[in-house]
Amino acid sequence: MGQEVSSVNNTKNEHHKTNKKSLKGGNERHEMKESSVGISKKIVENSFNNSKLRPGMFIQNSNVVFNEQYKGIKILGKGSFGEVILSRDKHTGHEYAIKVISKKHVKRKTDKESLLREVELLKMLDHINIMKLYEFFEDNNYYYLVSDVYTGGELFDEIISRKRFYEIDAARIIKQILSGITYMHKNNVVHRDLKPENILLETKNKEDMIIKIIDFGLSTHFEYSKKMKDKIGTAYYIAPDVLHGTYDEKCDIWSCGVILYILLSGCPPFNGSNEYDILKKVEAGKYTFDLPQFKKISDKAKDLIKKMLMYTSAVRISARDALEHEWIKMMTSKDNLNIDIPSLELSIANIRQFQSTQKLAQAALLYMGSKLTTIDETKELTKIFKKMDKNGDGQLDRNELIIGYKELLKLKGEDTSDLDNAAIEYEVDQILNSIDLDQNGYIEYSEFLTVSIDRKLLLSTERLEKAFKLFDKDGSGKISANELAQLFGLSDVSSECWKTVLKEVDQNNDGEIDFKEFRDMLVKLCNY
């Protein structure tokens, strides 16, 4: 450059050339900047649209104040760490069981870790037979865990009341427990404290007898290639391999075997006058069917117990194989779910019309479907889901959807004889692509509820307002780019990029979403 401008006579011309070069370079930089912004927008748009939605993403340690959000009605139970209070949501009128844990009793680091681990596990688990966590928050003195109200009491109390169960009832209960455990093990979660006290009955209805697995304080993630070593559990139900300090997820199956033995006989297989005696018998692993109660129990039922109580974990039956056991299939094959046809017709219509690529709308609907519905409102849909869930693992795969969809169409009265398999498979694939919100290849329970529930019921003003408040973290009356970024785990993305992503929802182009825009988005999606 110095050589080019060495002559005074050339200075003007060269200065002109230099300015042209600078201008050209500036344009290039400007174009590069625009290109970079465009790429960033495309990246966030792709990241946003490919976000995996699960109900657990809505459970955050929020700034809810108990007395502002809920009205305590009565104490349902007390424990060493706190109490469970029947409470009513002041905005929706829904009732919940809220576990209130005093921070005075959670001073040890291990206790707090156990509580937070339980919350994290419940956030990721989505199954009919596993306790549903709606909300988790804290104040200076307490932790609060908000869940459904289960009015049927503990399975333990039902055993005490009945003494023992008929085989068909025992099979229905153990099938549900195994369904929950199959789902947990598939998601690399082991419970480690299965017992009748940790299994609740959803309602007092003795015919349906829907169970819920609770208390995940001792639960943890596991790896199939690694053994666990912590010696934890309850004496009657603990597996011998846990006592030996080297075990895997099949410790849960041993506990299921003990529970089934108790359901059929009314007494535990490993008994003793104190905990030491019980543990010695567990360690020996010897039990007997030589009891009067077992004289009328079928060999097939005993066979399942034997396979569950195999001393060596490597040869112990898995949860999935136990679900497929001949005795369970035989005992539950004639279960009649008595599906309400109008509810069936409405759910099929809703599933067929659900087509959305708008991620925010999907997230809002998933929150409303999974967190703002009651047991009574979803009772018929639960029956439909269970009818479609052929292998009982609490998820619907493609094959189950194809078979179940045909059955439901027949129940609804449609003639499926003219529909070829290719047409049904195409429709099922469309459904799977639309409602598999976490993109794992299965339809989870909450996903099914979200797309099949009555839209008029779901989109009530009270529920819309509560859903809006979930996204509007600061209570400003508008959902900002930053609030969405936090919810979707994309906090490092600029607000300009979010405006591009949200342009189809943001009607007034202010870069935020107000309640009217939020409501219109959902109404448009649901054709309501």
Curated annotation (Swiss-Prot):
Q: Where is the lipid attached (N-myristoyl glycine)?
A: 2
What broad class describes the main subcellular location of this protein? cytoplasm
Q: What cofactors does this protein use?
A: Mg(2+)
Span(s) of short sequence motif J domain EF-hand interaction motif: 359-368
CDD domains reported for this sequence: EFh, STKc_CAMK
The record's GO molecular-function terms, alphabetically, read: ATP binding; calcium ion binding; calcium-dependent protein serine/threonine kinase activity; calcium-dependent protein serine/threonine phosphatase activity; calcium/calmodulin-dependent protein kinase activity; calmodulin binding; catalytic activity; protein serine kinase activity
Which positions bind Ca(2+) 1?
A: 389, 391, 393, 395, 400
Residues recorded as binding Ca(2+) 4, renumbered to this chain, are 506, 508, 510, 512, 517
Here the segments flagged for biased composition (Basic residues) are 14-23
Q: What are the UniProt keywords, alphabetically?
A: ATP-binding, Calcium, Cell membrane, Cytoplasm, Developmental protein, Differentiation, Kinase, Lipoprotein, Magnesium, Membrane, Metal-binding, Myristate, Nucleotide-binding, Phosphoprotein, Repeat, Serine/threonine-protein kinase, Transferase
Function in brief: Calcium-dependent protein kinase which acts as a sensor and effector of intracellular Ca(2+) levels probably in part downstream of cGMP-activated PKG kinase. Plays a central role in the host erythrocytes and hepatocytes infection cycles, sexual reproduction and mosquito transmission of the parasite. During the liver stage, involved in sporozoite motility and thus in sporozoite invasion of host hepatocytes, probably together with CDPK1 and CDPK5. Involved in merosome egress from host hepatocytes, probably together with CDPK5.
Q: Which GO terms describe its biological process?
A: cell differentiation; intracellular signal transduction; protein phosphorylation
Q: Could you tell me which species this protein originates from?
A: Plasmodium falciparum (isolate 3D7)
Query: Where is Ca(2+) 2 bound in this sequence?
Result: 436, 438, 440, 442, 447
Tell me where in or outside the cell this protein is found: Cytoplasm; Cell membrane
- Disruption of the gene: reported phenotype: Replication in host erythrocytes is normal.
* SMART domains associated with the record: EFh (SM00054), S_TKc (SM00220)
Instruction: Extract the ranges annotated as region (Disordered).
Output: 1-36
Question: Which named protein is this?
Answer: Calcium-dependent protein kinase 4
Notes concerning its domains: The junction domain (J domain) is composed of 2 motifs that maintain the kinase inactive. The N-terminal autoinhibitory motif acts as a pseudosubstrate inhibiting the catalytic domain while the C-terminal motif binds the EF-hand domains.
Task: Show where the EF-hand domain sits.
Answer: 376-411, 427-458, 459-494, 496-528
Example GO CC term: the record gives: plasma membrane
